[in-house]
Design a protein with these regions (language model features):
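Structural signature of multi-pass, alpha-helical inner-membrane proteins
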Residues: 1-18, 168-172, 178
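Membrane-embedded alpha-helices of multi-pass transport/permease systems
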Residues: 78-81, 85-88, 158
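Interfacial segments of transmembrane alpha-helices in multi-pass membrane proteins
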Residues: 8-63, 129-133
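Hydrophobic alpha-helical transmembrane segments of membrane transport and translocation systems
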Residues: 90-178
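Residue-level signature of catalytic and energy-coupling elements of molecular machines
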Residues: 6, 25, 54, 82, ...
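Hydrophobic residues within alpha-helical transmembrane segments
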Residues: 19, 23, 42-45, 67, ...
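Small-residue-enriched core segments of transmembrane alpha-helices in multipass membrane transport
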Residues: 38-59, 70-77, 138-153
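Hydrophobic alpha-helical bundle architecture
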Residues: 29-33, 54-65, 70, 74, ...
Length: 178
């Protein structure tokens, strides 16, 4: 639902800016990371779907701070994909096989993803505990978004990568850009 404090124009601008940001992410990721970029965008879409479904299940009211938290969540979620993709690229450059590069890339990126998300979650929890009104709403959406982002980055993207580049397939090259 939409809170009474949000005017029609604010809703429209917030949604439009999020959509344009999402389109920019799609283009950049697909061009820069090729197949892995498309996988990242699919993962981001699933993350957004999880977050919206969770907010809907909780019957949360959409406010401007909540919309800002969703936009921030999208940025953090795609950052996790970039970390994973870059780790995989590093492992390919180190001479590992494509399958080994994927496996090592996910393992090596996990610590960084966890650290960055936990520190942001601590800030979100502090905002929730000590904030009021719109600040609490922002904090709730942020924390839920962090949880869905971490789940999506590790489990959803890995499942898609495994589907595309399954362990039993003989792969000589990954489509992840240079």
């Amino acid at each position: 639902t939409v809170g009474p404090s949000m005017g029609k124009e604010n809703i429209s601008r917030g949604v439009q800016s999020t959509i344009w940001g999402f389109i920019a992410i799609i283009i950049m990721m697909a061009l820069y990371y090729m197949v892995f970029g498309v996988i990242s965008v699919i993962t981001l879409s699933v993350n957004l779907l999880f977050l919206v479904a969770l907010l809907s299940a909780l019957q949360a009211t959409l406010t401007l701070p909540g919309l800002a938290a969703i936009a921030l969540t999208l940025g953090m979620a795609i950052d996790s994909s970039v970390l994973i993709n870059e780790r995989i690229r590093d492992e390919i450059r180190n001479g590992n096989t494509p399958q080994a590069s994927i496996s090592i890339g996910y393992k090596m990126a996990w610590g960084t993803i966890l650290d960055s998300n936990i520190t942001t979650m601590i800030a979100g929890l502090a905002l929730f505990m000590f904030g009021s009104g719109p600040i609490k709403g922002f904090a709730v959406v942020l924390v839920l978004g962090i949880l869905t982002s971490m789940f999506s980055a590790i489990f959803v993207s890995r499942a898609i990568v495994n589907y595309v580049y399954g362990n039993k397939r003989q792969i000589s090259k990954l489509s992840i850009g240079e």
